[in-house]
């Protein structure tokens, strides 16, 4: 079944959510319920596109499908945080980006129809690995943004960019929820890798596995700092940045290291 129709519908709804929130932001209205509901509807439609795409492709994820799933996860975190904290302005960027991923996934047809379907455990490992990478990278980005926001709030007058950002406590809540989600998804990815991937500790994957475990510890230490001291501390932000850097090296830099260093 073609993904084009549901993909276009999801993309339209998500772009409408971003545009609606942008209009509300220009009016000085931080919260817009219509934008929020459009974001929720778009998130559900994007996940439906992923499920349908995986079914059509024998359970094998494509880059477009995994990008859509990652975008939906980040959108879900923003939407969940928006229920209690004024971070709706982030929908201006997150919703359209998720829509673009969904559009790409719906336009690019599956390429592995001739291959045997993946078993459920391997498919879960692949999906959670991609989600973990995105969530950890997102938490590291938020940690950098929070550190910059902390520094700039001490300066007067405030710059337009700082004034446009959500309040500090709302950003910290979003960061905390992102770290919790990243740690949980990374835990599932490592668990399924250890028990269901035969060559998980093989030499060609050992460096990725070690860096992923170190990133897991980084996220765990960041959460431990929160529960021990409360709030979002400087050490928590730095630890999240280190964890994100380690996982980025594991996923993006490993090939370059193997080819040019080793």
Name these PLM-found stretches.
Residues 2-12, 59-71, 204-215:
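Structural signature of hydrophobic alpha-helical transmembrane segments
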Residues 152-196:
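A mid-sequence, solvent-exposed acidic-amphipathic segment
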Residues 30-40, 62-68, 87-99, 236-242:
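Cytoplasmic-side transmembrane-helix entry/capping segments in multi-pass membrane proteins
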Residues 10, 123-142:
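Alpha-helical transmembrane segments
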Residues 82-132:
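Hydrophobic alpha-helical segments and helix pairs
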Residues 1-15, 132-136, 261:
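Hydrophobic transmembrane alpha-helical segments in integral membrane proteins
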Residues 249-262:
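Juxtamembrane boundary at the C-terminal end of a transmembrane helix
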Residues 224-246:
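Interfacial loop-to-transmembrane junctions
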């Amino acid at each position: 079944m073609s993904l084009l129709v549901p993909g276009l519908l999801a993309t339209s709804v998500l772009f409408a959510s971003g545009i609606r929130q942008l209009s509300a932001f220009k009016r000085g209205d931080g919260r817009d319920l219509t934008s929020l509901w459009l974001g929720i509807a778009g998130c559900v439609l994007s996940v439906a596109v992923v499920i349908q795409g995986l079914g059509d492709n024998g359970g094998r994820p494509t880059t477009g499908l995994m990008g859509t799933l990652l975008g939906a996860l980040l959108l879900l975190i923003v939407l969940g945080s928006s229920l209690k904290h004024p971070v709706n302005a982030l929908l201006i960027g997150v919703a359209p980006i998720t829509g673009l991923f969904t559009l790409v996934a719906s336009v690019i047809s599956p390429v592995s129809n001739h291959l045997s379907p993946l078993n459920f455990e391997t498919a879960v490992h692949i999906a959670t690995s991609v989600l973990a990478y995105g969530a950890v990278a997102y938490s590291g980005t938020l940690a950098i943004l929070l550190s910059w926001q902390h520094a700039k709030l001490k300066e007067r007058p405030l710059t337009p960019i700082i004034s446009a950002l959500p309040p500090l406590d709302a950003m910290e809540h979003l960061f905390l929820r992102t770290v919790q989600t990243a740690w949980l998804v990374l835990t599932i990815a490592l668990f399924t890798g250890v028990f269901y991937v035969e060559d998980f500790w093989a030499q060609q994957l050992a460096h990725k596995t070690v860096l992923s475990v170190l990133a897991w510890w980084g996220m765990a230490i960041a959460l431990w700092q929160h529960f021990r001291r409360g709030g979002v501390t400087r050490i928590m932000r730095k630890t999240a940045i280190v964890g994100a850097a380690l996982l980025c090296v594991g996923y993006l830099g490993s090939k370059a290291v193997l080819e040019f260093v080793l």
